[in-house]
Every structure is written in structure tokens, then in C-alpha cells.
Amino acid sequence: MKDINIILTRHGRYNNSRDKSDLSIGHITEEGKREIAEKTKKRIDRIVGNKLKDTTFLIIASPTYWLSDERFGRRAIETEKVTKAEIMEELKQEGLSEEEAKSHFYLKPEIYTRQKTNGVSIEELRDKLAEPNVYDLAPSYIEKLKVRYGGMNSGFWKELASSEEVKQYNKDAEGPTDLRRKITELLNYVVEWSKDYSKSQDTNVCIFLITHGETMEPFIQNRKLSHITEFGYNEGIVFNVKEDGIIIKTEDELFIGPPPKVKDGYILGRD
């Protein structure tokens, strides 16, 4: 079986000001761009290694605008662009032309699986990585948590990722169970697609899923995969897909998941 790795990661450093008179808010900063490029290079070196020319890349990022306002930045989409640019540079350093490097990215608008023979659109998959709608649909709950914890600190984020109290404010607001389900469904789709695609095209596959800390943390906490309660900028975990299971690792390759070769359904499954 060829190598298949899925990197679930938070977006990079951005201008998190809420001053709506500043149109640079929500955009990845120059420091953030450098950090993303450096992190991507390290990831490629560690995860892909000398198999770069025999690897197909798929990058899917959250479509969310900062403050849900189209005037401002889309930090996950911008992280995707920097990530892709760095991978392109790595490929060209291997002697590939611009067009040859581009051919190493899966760019079709859908992926196809046995579950979804008509295809699942990349846009639908992007939506599963979106920032939780709690900020728009239950702002009073967010304000209550801020008061309870004295701001948006570690206690705030831990409760946001684990409590279903938000449903008391708006039943349509996404709670931890909703977010876990979205990430689970996304992972199930891309795992199945990557296995089929890798086999049919005889290629290694490396997938970047770029999202928000609030979206990925409920999945991690519920599966008891690690001590992580909060992800820093561009931090994430790696799913190493095997024929008979999935191994999950942190960025520094400390093992945090169930024992190797655990069946897919145990780690992913459906809530």
C-alpha cells in the first residue's frame, strides 16, 4: 500500500482585531505567512520525505470569513494558498516545471467514494471545516462564557469544545456533538477516497484539512486521543492511513491515538 497521510490543522497566524474600520483584519499576517511556509516545509520533509515526486496533494480549507463578513480575511483559505505555494516550491526544487508541479495536486471539484458514487463536492467538504456558527447564532452564550472565565482563555475554549449548553440559547447553534459529526464525516470521506485514489492511480496521497481550533478540538477531546485542549496557529495532528487501520500522531510524532492498526471505525466511525 502506498503512503496516505491526512493533516488536520488549524489556520495560520492572522490579524485578529475586531476593529471593522481596518480592512486588514482576518487576513494572515506576514509573520503568519512565514510560519506557514516553514511549517509546511517541515511537514513535507517529515511526512512525505523522498517520495515527493510520487505524491498527490489535496488541500481543503474552511471558507469562513473573519467575523462572518466578506469584507475581511479568510484565514483558512489564505493558509491554503501559502501551503500550496510552498509545496509547489518543494516540487520545483525536485526539478519539476511549473506545470508538472501543478499536476501533483488533485484539483477536480468532487471526490468520489463507494458511499458517494456521484461524488462529494469540495465545497461541501469545505463547509465541514467551517468555523462554528455559535458566534452568529448564540452570541449571548459566547458573552456568558467570556464573563464566566474572564475572557477567551483556556477555560473558555475548553468549555466551548465540551459543553452542549449552547443549545439552550439556540437549538440551531453548533455544539460539540455537531462539530464532531462534521469532522467525522469529512474524515470518513477523505479516508475512503484516498485509499481508492491511491490504489487506482498508484500514488502516495497527502491531504491538508485546514480549519479552526473550535472546529477540530471537540473531535480530539471526544476521542480521548490526547491531552490537547487547544491548538496554536497552524498546529495539528496527522492521520497515517494503513490498510487495516489508522495511526494518529501529533506534529512531533508522539503517539497519541489508540494502538497501531486499530480499525478505522473505532477511530472515525459515525456519532
Range-by-range predicted roles:
Residues M1-T117, V166-T177, R181, S226-D252, ...:
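Active-site-proximal alpha-helix that buttresses catalytic centers in soluble enzyme cores
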Residues R18, E78, E123, K128-E131, ...:
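Active-site-proximal flexible loops/turns
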Residues K20, R181-K249:
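Active-site-adjacent alpha-helix immediately C-terminal to a catalytic or transition-state-stabilizing loop
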Residues L254-D271:
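Acidic, His/Gly-rich catalytic cores of divalent-metal-dependent hydrolytic chemistry
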